[in-house]
Amino acid sequence: GMALGSLLADYGARRVTYCDQLPFKAIGEAAFLGYGFDLQRFNEVMAGRARFVNTRSRGAFADYATVKVPGGGELASAWEVNRTYVETDVLVSLGKLKSHVSGGITGGMKNLFGIPPSSLYGDDLKQEPSEDALDYRGATMHACTRKPFTSADYFNGKSVEGDHGFNVPRFIVDLNSAFPIHLVVLDAISVIQTAE
């Protein structure tokens, strides 16, 4: 990640935002320390142009961005997400090569599965959205046993309850239609097997 950021800064990027949905309350750099990412070290090699954003909620923004899926989508017609994902000129998917039970091999496309925030799509939600939610999206996007707490009903009802092998690949297509990736960089040296 740091090497890629250094290259992007060298080639003129004014700012490089590393964002991910992390299971920590902190929304900024403190969330990334749990995984060993030190913003100061990144900024030393990137001329101060790096920033870290935990996108598990709306974060510092007043509201969520609603991003439509072109063509209506396979299972979702739109996504409500942290605005970091839309206030960008270039979207780079930076991930580890992983194998998944339901998504096959995680490449650049499956890596976008973390975009929908826990605050609207998370398993630890009870009856309403919560900016404090930290949990994964198993019930909404794997098993499809409940809908997310978005401002409108964007899931079209074509999912198969309990069938993550059907649901996950189709949500991956919908996410990639809504958030086209400009560049994919995969770490295929440190791989993860059977992540889920």
Regions found by a protein language model. Give the residues of each.
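Extended, low-polarity segments enriched in aliphatic/aromatic residues
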Residues: G1-E196
